[in-house]
Every structure is written in C-alpha cells, then in structure tokens.
Amino acid sequence: MRHVQAETSPSSEPEAGPSQPAVRQGALQGGLLMGYSPAGGATSPGVYQVSIFSPPAGASEPPRALKRPAPPTEGPRELKRGPGLGAREGLSPEEPPTVGLLGPEGLGLKLGVASQHFCHHGLCVVEQGGSSTSPWTSGARSSPLPPSNASCSTLHTRDWASPDPRGQGSLGSSLGPAPPGQLHTLDTDLHSLAQIGGKSLVSGVGNGGSPWPRESPGTANGCSPEHTPPGPGPPGPCPTKRRLLPAGEALDVSSEDEGPAPRRRRGTLGHPPAANSSDAKATPFWSHLLPGPKEPVLDPTDCNPMGRRLKGARRLKLSSLRSLRKGPGLLSPPSASPVPAPAVSRTLLGNFEESLLRGRFAPSGRIEGFTAEIGASGSYCPQHVTLPVTVTFFDVSEQNAPAPFLGVVDLSPLGRKGYSVPKVGTIQVTLFNPNQTVVKMFLVTFDFSDMPAAHMTFLRHRLFLVPVGEEGNAGPTRRLLCYLLHLRFRSSRSGRLSLHGDIRLLFSRRSLELDTGLPYELQAVTEAPHNPRYSPLP
C-alpha cells in the first residue's frame, strides 16, 4: 500500500473551461489531479491509497469514505491529466458515477475542498476532512479511516502555493497529457508532484499572480508539521511531504525549495561516497548529518627542509632526555637514521694470490666435508683441535688451467681468546678431504718472543715447485705456487700469544702438469711483515 498526503486551502470559484461542463460548483475548489492506468486490466493486484486533507466546508458531518465500483475494462488504458481547478465546462450535472474518468483511456481524480474516497481498480482515495454537499458524497458510505493514514515517513515537507483564483499557475494548468502509449505508475506521478509544484509557483509569479507568502513549516503553527494533526489551517502554503533524497541529490533542488542553509549544503560535499549514493532506499536519511573527513593540519615547519631538520633534532633531544630520566644503567644512544654500510670493494689486488686470499673472486661452488687439525709445540703443547674447513673453488680461466681451492678455518668456536700457542715454537696444520685422507700437512716455525703486549702480526707460509738446482736463483716465472697457509697472531694485554680470527689455505685441486724433462722440488718460504713487524690492537 502506498500513501501520499496533500493539504489544500480553500479558494474562490473556478472558472469554467471549454472542455467539460460545469459540475460540483462549490464542492471541488482547486486541488490535485492524479491518474492511474493499470497495466494488467481488471486483474491488476496493486492497490494504491491516496489521502487528501482539506478544511471543512461549514458542515459538522464526520468524514466518510465512498466506495465506487470499478468501471468496465476497455482495452489498455493510458494516463491523461485533466484540469485541476474546480468544475470544468462540458460536464453535465447528471454525469454517471464514472465521473473522474477522462474517457476510456485512464482515470482522472479531482480533489476539492471536501475530500473524496474512490476505489477504482487498484486505486483507493480516502476522504478525511469536512463534508460537502457534492454528488461525490451521495451513495453508500463507510466508516472513516483512522488518522494514521495521514502520515507518511518517507516524504519530505515542501511548500505548495495555493491555486490562483484566475486559474493561472495552478497545478491543473501545469499538467499536460501524457504521450500516447506510455503507461504511468502512481509512484512516478507522486515523485513528479514536487517538481510540478515548484514550476507552477514560478509561472504564477511571472503571469502577475501573487503567490501566498511563505513561512517555515516549523513555525507555521508553532510546532513541526510532522506532529501537527490534520485540520483547518491558515490560508498560507500547505506543506506537503515528499520522498527523502540522499545527500548528493539534495543539492540539485531548485532555489524555491526549502532546504538547509548554504553552509549546510557545502558541508554535504565532503561526505563519504556511501552518503552520495543515488539509491535513496539504501541510504540512511541521517547520512547528511555525519561529520565530514577532517583535513590534516600541516605544520609550517614541514614545508621546508630546514624546518624538517629542526623537528628531527628536537625529537632526538627529547628521546635522549627520556633515556636520561630512566637512569644511567638504561641509557641508550639516541635513535638516528641508519648510516649505510660502506660498499665493499671487489676489485682485484696486486696479484692473483692476494685477490684469492681476500675473497675478491666470486666462488663457483662450495665443497663440504673438509676438516683441519691444529696443534702446536714449544714451551708447552696445547691440545690439538679439529675444526671444519669451508672450501670454495673458482673458475678464473677460459682454458683448462687448474684453479686453486680456498679453505677457511673459523677459530670463533674456540672462544674469544682463540687458540693459545707458545711465543716460540712450531705450528702444525693438517688438512683432510671428505674421505678423511690427508691432503697436506703444514709445519710452520715461528719466534715472537719480542712481540709486545696488545699487538698483532701474521705469517704467510708458501710452498713452491722450482726446478732442481735453482732454489736460490729461480725467478717468479719459474716458481709454481702449490700450497699456501696464512696465520694471524695476537698478544693479549697480559702477553699471552694465540691464533685468532681464521686460518686461510690455498691448495690445488689436482696435481700440477710439469715438464717431465726438468726435475722439480718443493721449496718452502715463510714471510712476515717487516716495517712495522707488529701492529697495535685497534
């Protein structure tokens, strides 16, 4: 069931039109004209009820409703709007009970001072208001409907101008016939009433008519129109309720409509998208009351680099003060932006040997399972230890030349002090392959008796293949490096000597291909730094 509420005010006698005869003089003074054309003939199930309120015409007779039988169905019906002011010329007083039907195409209802009740094929108009001596009130009467039909919560209030006595700018004159073949529903007509009302007011002023002075619906009677009972009121504009519009559509209403202040309308522009939806049924009516998103307040210091730098320094100072408040035991350095680590240079060093020992070549692979046994002898013999060896190999030549292996023995599992050795003695390092076969045993003699406390140095032990008889005169081009052992020593503050860091080894993956015509022998060379020989600990 759909409801619409409209209130009209009394007006003078309307003029007779040339299209219909004069009838119901004094009974139907102005009003609204609505039509309903069923799409399915006499079997349409939809029923619409329209309640119109008007001041009584001087009679104390209680409001009553009149039910009329449905007219015979005559093919498809179309909606036609007729004049909406009083009686028209061309209608005889003896019009049959089907008065209100403008021909067989549709149904036209004329609503005057005395409200009428009709029931025609899905349309029901209920009379609520004063009675009048009109042919519409003759016949069987039913009990009046409760006043609950007078309210409709889905409509907004809107001012309507009363019809002009001369018929200019009236609602009836602004309504035109619908295009042929177009079927209208009552819902569409009800929603179009608000726009038609606004247009009629403007046209009335343009033709010289003086519309009724407007006043706010909330101040007309001293109370809200929603809580005002239907009844006679002042001859001012009667508020009519219309459907709620979403916040986005409320801005499109013409300037004659009553609406929120301009400041309120501008505030609705910042609503979330859900409040600006065009679906009024899915949008809550209070969405325009929601607060808009707050714009972030920008600090003037954020606009320049100097301000940002000062703000960062202020934050660092505050954080340091908080840490000082916690106590000296909990003092932590102020948090600053992380300093990027220096880029590690991967350029090659002066020779191939140094580049391999420093890791300047990218390894081609890694071999697991190598181990190294470390021992020492001298003024005392420390316990031998066995540690894993990380072995990597390289592909540094396009030819089939052999490339050495690089083995690294990490001494960190032995503790911070490393592997303790005497100041004068011999160090033995034995390398085992994954099959636990000895690859090479290194024996290195050292003498660091003059090494001061808290200093460090290193030893590099090499094994070359040189031709026999050229041990002392063999040049670098005649020597072939076979094995290399790099040891690092450190003296503690108490003067104790130990191996620290790691031990690095170079060895060949297979036997060297030598010229069989010349005999070769191994030559061991141990080197240490000369100037300075010892360096202080960092």
UniProtKB/Swiss-Prot annotation:
Belongs to the ATOS family. GO terms for cellular component: nucleus. It comes from the Eukaryota. InterPro entries: Atos-like_C, Atos-like_cons_dom, ATOS_Transcription_Regulators. The protein contains a transactivation domain (TAD) which may be required for transcriptional activation of a subset of target genes. The gene is ATOSB. Transcription regulator that may syncronize transcriptional and translational programs. Residues 1-12, 129-141 have a biased composition (Polar residues). Residues 227-238 have a biased composition (Pro residues). Pfam families: Chromosome_seg, DUF4210. Its main location: nucleus. Residues 348-430 are annotated as: Required for macropage invasion. The modification Phosphoserine is found at residues 254-255. It is found in: Nucleus. It comes from Bos taurus. Residues 436-444 are annotated as: Transactivation domain 1 (TAD1). Residues 1-98, 129-185, 201-303 are annotated as: Disordered. Keywords: Nucleus, Phosphoprotein. This is Atos homolog protein B. The keyword Phosphoprotein applies.
